[in-house]
Each structure stands twice: as structure tokens, then as C-alpha cells.
Amino acid sequence: MATIHVDGKELEVDGADNLLQACLSLGLDIPYFCWHPALGSVGACRQCAVKQYTDENDKRGRIVMSCMTPATDGSWISIDDEEAKVFRASVVEWLMTNHPHDCPVCEEGGHCHLQDMTVMTGHNERRYRFTKRTHQNQDLGPFISHEMNRCIACYRCVRFYKDYAGGTDLGVFGAHDNVYFGRVEDGTLESEFSGNLTEVCPTGVFTDKTHSERYNRKWDMQFSPSICHGCSSGCNISPGERYGELRRIENRFNGSVNQYFLCDRGRFGYGYVNRKDRPRQPLLANGAKLSLDQALDKAAELLRGRNIVGIGSPRASLESNYALRELVGAEHFYSGIEAGELERIRLVLQVLKDSPLPVPNMRDIEDHDAVFVLGEDLTQTAARMALALRQSVKGKAEDMADAMRVQPWLDAAVKNIGQHALNPLFIASLAETKLDDVAEECVHAAPDDLARIGFAVAHALDASAPAVDGLDSEAAALAQRIADALLAAKRPLIIAGTSLGSKALIEAAANIAKALKLREKNGSISLIVPEANSLGLAMLGGESVDAALQAVIDGSADAIVVLENDLYTRTDKAKVDAALNAAKVLIVADHQKTATTDRAHLVLPAASFAEGDGTLVSQEGRAQRFFQVFDPQYLDASILVHEGWRWLHALRATLLDQPIDWTQLDHVTAAVASSSPQLAAIVDAAPSASFRIKGLKLAREPLRYSGRTAMRADISVHEPRTSQDNDTAFSFSMEGYSGSTEPRSQVPFAWSPGWNSPQAWNKFQDEVGGHLRAGDPGTRLIESQGDHLSWFASVPRAFNPAPGTWQVVPFHHLFGSEENSSKAAPVQERIPAAYVSLAKSEADRLGVNDGALLSLNVAGQTLRLPLRINEELGAGLVALPAGLAGIPPAIFGKTVDGLQEAAQ
């Protein structure tokens, strides 16, 4: 710690910070533009000027940039010095000379850091009367709008996009006061993190195009704290609603998880919530709509006297899955996950519980100094983790700078010192990945061969680990280099997962973790699972969807209740058809129209994450609560959407002729927690419904929320009472606490007086860029309890397919491989057409060129797909895009026994 003096006040700060960060952490206001907590300091904008004095006797002082000045012990500075204030006001005035002053029509208005800083400096009069510089805007794709005339040349966009996220297609062109931030030519931004430009940019240059179509100001939206359902990373989000529609998603700061950034799937994939074809009333097979009571009575009538199986879902909350389990009985509850995938997820859970190495949170990943990624294409399967890995490899430059006594926040200096030095990252994958550019070495091979390399690394680390027979010398040498790098590191990290359908990859990663612990290395292990609640569902229990379908086919059950799951995306279509044909009753509770709801005798309209509350467990083992954003019935009483757990508990009560005893979320969450010691801590994931600040509930709406009395005027001039939320500590209103002074971990939207942009998160943190003052949201359910793992000894044989056969492997796509986000119109523009991928050597052997139409026979099906030649894919492999339309879900791992150019 260091003692500094600010305008005569003696204050304690972190001496490792710069003055800007230190003062902001104290709650003092200094305007800034180019600095960002995640990007460090470059001193480009000159906006954060303060007066620095030699000591208490110095009356003259000198102007310094606070972001470039360390907060050394004994520093004397002034923020309120008149010369410093005039300097800051003049900087804003210079920046505004070419700004269009178009706040009333700018989509950033009311959400704009430039507005906040202009007001903060007191600049309120335009003196510039000359021609303004203008630019041509670019079409940057379906996610981002571009308005270059608003640019103040802070350089934040390129520093994030290129330096932080590793993007290559956004740059800065020109010189002096005529610079241009964009692409060489119009075109979709290629980075999977491009959406963060909308929050990183302090002005309205980059704005959310998906929000533009149905735009409203930030102060006119209703928000809630929520969790992204796009993958298993558990990123925190702030969804905003107006008129019963989800309008945009912003990043919600969680210092242990996503911090300031999201991937584009999580930010722009919300459109499925607004789809017109969603079930919003209970529906019979003939299309007849039912009231709530009629639906419950009909469901009970259909199920009475039946042998029921319940099929849950890894995209549904723990509460909803538990309610289904209570309805049908634990022995008749099935997870809704394909058998092989469920086996792998259970293995992940076992390894994480028994591993001698801890599971890192997302932020912690950035602090590891050697990483081995085994089998995962992280940018496509856990994109936010890939972004964290990019920061981990940069730790080498920070170490070099530290040796030269250069502070890590001096971004340009650290880059100059480090040049191209990176911490070692090794990637073993099917083919090239978006992280290959920062990897020390990459190897591309079949899943079994990748696993063999992993087992060999474990054996190289510790000779007691199972050896790999018949490993070629090149692979053995690579395994030794990886082992040496992991041993040389202070904090090595192993990452694997389920995406390639290989248990052996997970087992190899577990062996490496055990070997590292035996070598007394302070490392970590992280394992990726497919969906938002895959790990939570594995903790809850239940057999595979295949077992459920087989029970119906065999006649042991004749009724199926499906929760938020499209069975046709899980397993073989013929098997699903056979089970649904055999079932006398099919009831589906879902928020989407799917092939399964099309077969249902009764559809119960379930709530999406925006309309309901629940708990998810991320791949880290962090239980986190998502909260209802809006009440759809407030604007349309005919909508009968309810959380899955409400429908299923009410149905159970109707069947048993009992009263409903889960009347609020806390009741069902407590029931889930009491059902298993492993889930006992989920009650601590968020405050209960009784939580208050100064006697107030927490406001979902900003204080300036307008138009509430007019929103239903077309229905009735009599304004109804706002919806009452008995489930949570939040109110569907601006009435309630919305400030930043009282600590709270669940923050619907970031706002503080004078701070309307996302930079307002500064006011909620213990120190800027640190953690929330009340603690980061969520609670960990998995902590390392010592080494309880035995060596996994089933090393697979080397991949050697029979002549004329190929193994089907999955290529995952951030846009397209996840079911719900793929229903969002902007995301659909980024989804590739279905294809088949082969190695160049295989294409040459078949005599086909890129783009040729191929016919392949696999698992009794014939597919006709265009060819994409992949130079890095191994021989004997056929890669298909997982999750895309036209690609059967049960095809991966199967053998292709007929592959040829299709007859036109």
C-alpha cells in the first residue's frame, strides 16, 4: 500500500496502480478516454490530467497524465487545481471540434462515456465554427454499426480488437487529426469478440446493430442480472427489455468470470427469445389454445394411470429439472443428454471433484504461465476462455517488464519490452484453431492420437503414469517438450473437454494433473462441458436420453414429459421417432417451437431465461442465479408463459390433488439444495427474496425510466399496478434501490450519478478492475479436496482406419453449433452452410476439388454435402459441422464406408 495526498487529503491506495486507477478506486472522479481497466495505459488522449507536486511545500506543481503516473508513496496531487481543470476542458474541446454533436440521434446517447466526460469537465459551449472532418462509414456485418464521424481517436477499439482479442481485420489508417478506424474494405468483422467494441468505444462509433432495429435509450429499458445460456462458461450478462421484447444484452461485470467482455454468441444470440413462433399459450396437438387451469387439468388427465418418463435438459435450470424429477420420481427421471456425452460429463465431474489440482475461474486462467490445450477448439466451444488464454500468454512480456521495473499497466512499454515473447501455449487439436497464432507448438491429429500425446505428457512428467506403447518418435519428442514447459512453469494449466466425443482426452488431462501434483507443481485443470447447465444436471442425476427412449420403445413407459429439450437434436432420429410413435402421451414444456413440440399432445409454454428465474452450474462448478427480466403478462394478459418448474410443480399438485407448496423461487431452490450434499450451497448463489437495501427492493429500471403510464394506453387508460415479484429481491419498477454506494453482488445495470456508460462499473468495485465490493456473484460447488484420482490406464490405440473408411469428427462453430442462439436472425447470417471437410491428401486421392459435392454413407444414412478442403485435418478423418442443419447429431464417432463425388 502507498499513502498519497489528493487535494490535501491523505489516502491509502495500492502502490502498484497508476494515479488514475488509484483515484477511481477511491471513488474520485477523473475524466479519461483512452485508458481502460483491462487494456492499461497509453496516454493517447491527454484527458486525465492532474497537477502533481514535489511535496506539501510545492505551490506550483506540474501537469501530468494520471494514467501514466505511478501512485508512489508520498505523492501529492490535485484534481481540482484550476490549471488542471482548464487543461482537461480544453482537451475535450479539441476532441469535440470534429464531433457531429448528434447526441439526439446517436444510439450511444444516455449510454455514452464521451457525454459523461464532457459534462464532468464542464465543456458546454461550442466555439469551433469551421468545416468538420467527415468520413465514409463501413458495413461491418450483422452485429456492429459504424459511424466514424463520432470518433475521438482514443485508440481503444484497435487496442482491444488487435492487442487484447487478437483480431486482424480492424485497423487504424491515416495520420494526425485525420485517422480512420475500420477495415481495409467493407465486410463482416471476423473476431468472435467484435461486439465488445460497442462497450469499449467511449462514443457512438461502434454500436449494437441488433438493437438498432428496435431501439430505445438505456434509461427506458428494464434489466436484470442474468447468466449467458450460450455455453458452459457462465458469463454474467445484463439483458435489457422494452415492450415485452429483449432489446439488447450487455456485459455484466463479474471479477471472477467474464470481467468486462463477452463473446459474440452471448451478446447477439438472444433473438430466439423474441421469435414470433414461440409457444406463448398452452397448445393441444390440433392447435387449440387452453387456459392455465385447462392446461393443468388436461395434462393431469393425459398422465393419470400412465407409466411416465421425464426427460430433462442441460439448457434448463436446476430448479426446473428438479421439478420434473419430483413429478415423475427419481428412478424415472432422465437427463436428456445422449449416452456417450453423459458418460463424458460424469467423467468430467468425477475428475474435477477428485483432482489434486484446483479448477481455475476465468480470471485465474489469465495468471497461468504455461498451458496445454488437449482436444478443444476453445474459440468455438468456450470462446470467453479462449480470450482469457490470450491474456495468459502475454504474461511473459509482463514478467520481462517487471524485471526491468516497468509497471504492467504501461501497455506500450510492456509490449516494446516483450516484443513477440509469449508464455508457452501448446494446442493439440483436430485442425487449426483461432489460438494457433499465439501457440508455441500445435499438433493436429485424430482424437485417439491426441489422447495418446496427452498420456505421453503425463508419463514424461512422472514415470509412474501409464506409458504409451508404440508412440512414434516425433510425438514422443513433442510430449517431452510439453512436459518440460509445464514443469518449468510456476502455474501450469491443463484444458480439455467433451467436444470431440473422446473420454480418453479427459482421462489423459486428469493423468497430467495428477502427475503435475506429484511433481509438486501449483497448477490447475479446467474441463469444458457442452451446455449452460451440463455440469449441474450431472450433479442432479438421471440417465441418458437414449435410456428414456428405450424404456418407451420397450413398453416399460407409455408417457413422456419433456422439459426444454428437442430430442431430435440429441440422438438418432429413427430412435426418437420410434419412441414417440410408441408413446401414448407426449407433453413438452419449452420456450421454443421444435421438432419435438410439433409431435406433442400438449405444449406448455415455458419461460426463457428472460422471463424466468433459476440456477445454472458452469464448467468451473460455479452455481449462479439468473433473474427474470420482465413479466410478459403485463403487456399481454393472454401470454401464459411460466418457468418450467412452476408448470411441473403445479402439474404434480394437480395429479396428486395437493396444494401448491412451492410458491416462490426460494422454496424450490431450497428443495434442490436439500436433495443432494453436492448441491447444498446453491442457496448461496444469490440473495433470497427477502434481501433489501435500506428497506428497499432492488430496481430493475433506471430512475429515468419513462412512458410506463402510456405503455398500455392502447389497451386501457387505467394503469394497472406494476407486476409484483415475490420470487426475488428485485422490483419490476424504478422504485427501489439502484445506486452504487451500498455493496451488492446482483446488479441489474451499471449506473452511478455522472456515470451512464459501462464505465460505471468502476463505482461497484472494491478497486477498479478488481472484484465487486459485495463479492462476485455465484458460489463454487467444487473445490479440490486432495488427490483422490487413480491413474487412468486405458490408453487408446493409434488411429489407423481400414482402407476405404473414415471416422466422422466434429468441427464446432461459435455461430451454428448451439441450438438456441442459432435461431437469432443476426447469428443466422454468420452460420456457414453445412459442409464436409477432408484433408488435401484425401481429396487428391478421391480426385475432387474444393467445393465439389460429395456423397457419404454413414450410420445407415447418406449425406450430400459440398467439400471444404482443410490442410491441417488428418488422413482418415471426415469432419462435419456439429449442430448445423442437415447434420445428424448421432453421427460423430461413426465410420464412413462410402465417400465419393455425388452425381449431379
Curated annotation (Swiss-Prot):
Co-factor note (free text): Binds 1 [2Fe-2S] cluster per subunit. Binds 3 [4Fe-4S] clusters per subunit.
Record field: catalytic activity: a quinone + NADH + 5 H(+)(in) = a quinol + NAD(+) + 4 H(+)(out)
E.C. designation(s): 7.1.1.-
Residues the record lists as binding [4Fe-4S] cluster 3: C228, C231, C235, C263
Summary of subunit composition and partner proteins: Composed of 13 different subunits. Subunits NuoCD, E, F, and G constitute the peripheral sector of the complex.
Reported function: NDH-1 shuttles electrons from NADH, via FMN and iron-sulfur (Fe-S) centers, to quinones in the respiratory chain. The immediate electron acceptor for the enzyme in this species is believed to be ubiquinone. Couples the redox reaction to proton translocation (for every two electrons transferred, four hydrogen ions are translocated across the cytoplasmic membrane), and thus conserves the redox energy in a proton gradient. Required for plants roots colonization.
Protein name, as recorded: NADH-quinone oxidoreductase subunit G
